[in-house]
């Protein structure tokens, strides 16, 4: 296969160490690839990111040298075993038409459930077990990296194991597939593929916004599947009503079944996610390190998991044990970037909303209990989440000197140590602030 030949060509251009560690871990996905798209499967996000960033352009060039066409290079996550398919062959869905591969590690068992995602998890399980009966369609919405794709794959993997026909694609892949069949005058094959499955799973459906041609095609696909009691599951970064450029008839249909959100994970859930990831990958991190990562990184689960892989990779490359100091050194730039992205105004906005105190009151010299408490919390969070110094905060709040800031910090720290509920409030405020950036 050309994809494998291209990897062998790349082998001659790079070091043996790089080839063994990264390129050798890839598998060319012939079924998902086309003349304008070359798809490789990687075992984890770290390798996928590394190959895409460092070798993506070179791989595209090597393809171009052989075929005269420069394809888009996609690195997807999945099993390296060649017999893993995204759906079971059934009449009308031929084996050669599978558009992508489900991530075998994304199952209901590997999904970490917390207050932030419990409802979406329960609804997804219900839909997986009751095709076209429980909620059809199911649309899960929420920010990037919160677990929407994990649940989508979980539904797919559960039903593949049951012998069901499953198609899982991103909305961009659906569009590219549509354009490919339009160009080749094979729309009958496209419709056979997407309208003859038991489960149609589409990720990031907000991508359809502003694209009337693909919306028209999907409208008819949706209707045919729904009329046959076939299950449709969609994800989006916003509610149907918030998707700009989406036709009203599709917005209406997306709300026919169930619309469920996923919120940023609370601290306890983040800790459990890290522990689960470490257990799955056979990586040991102390509770101290796990707590450090959960507290200092944002709420994007995908990024948190990538950090764990990065830590482990650095430790292996440098032949070092992962200690707290080692973790701090490896992650310091990412944490610095996190802190620089959060502003004092962001913090004031969130705290004022959650504690029901006006932003102007927090910035004032008002001394009522509620206002003073909110101001102390803002100061504590600003020192924790941003690069603001104590003198700069004292100046912002019109205090005499930074000793007043130090006193506010000490008061909040003491209350955190003595009151578990207050500590939880602070952690939730941190999460809400980080999720806005």
From Swiss-Prot:
Region (Domain III, AAA+ region): 101-315
Molecular function terms from GO: ATP binding; ATP hydrolysis activity; DNA replication origin binding; lipid binding
Keywords: ATP-binding, Cytoplasm, DNA replication, DNA-binding, Lipid-binding, Nucleotide-binding
Gene3D superfamilies: 1.10.1750.10, 1.10.8.60, 3.30.300.180, P-loop containing nucleotide triphosphate hydrolases
GO biological process: one example: regulation of DNA replication
Stretches the record annotates as Domain IV, binds dsDNA: 316-437
InterPro entries according to UniProt: AAA+_ATPase, Chromosome_initiator_DnaA, Chromosome_initiator_DnaA-like, Chromosome_initiator_DnaA_CS, DnaA_C, DnaA_dom, DnaA_N_dom, DnaA_N_sf
Function: Plays an essential role in the initiation and regulation of chromosomal replication. ATP-DnaA binds to the origin of replication (oriC) to initiate formation of the DNA replication initiation complex once per cell cycle. Binds the DnaA box (a 9 base pair repeat at the origin) and separates the double-stranded (ds)DNA. Forms a right-handed helical filament on oriC DNA; dsDNA binds to the exterior of the filament while single-stranded (ss)DNA is stabiized in the filament's interior.
Protein location: Cytoplasm
Name listed for the protein in its UniProt record: Chromosomal replication initiator protein DnaA
Gene Ontology CC annotation, any one: plasma membrane
Stretches for region Domain II: 69-100
Main localisation: cytoplasm
UniProt record similarity statement: Belongs to the DnaA family.
Binding site for ATP: 145, 147-149
Note on domains (UniProt): Domain I is involved in oligomerization and binding regulators, domain II is flexibile and of varying length in different bacteria, domain III forms the AAA+ region, while domain IV binds dsDNA.
Subunit structure: Oligomerizes as a right-handed, spiral filament on DNA at oriC.
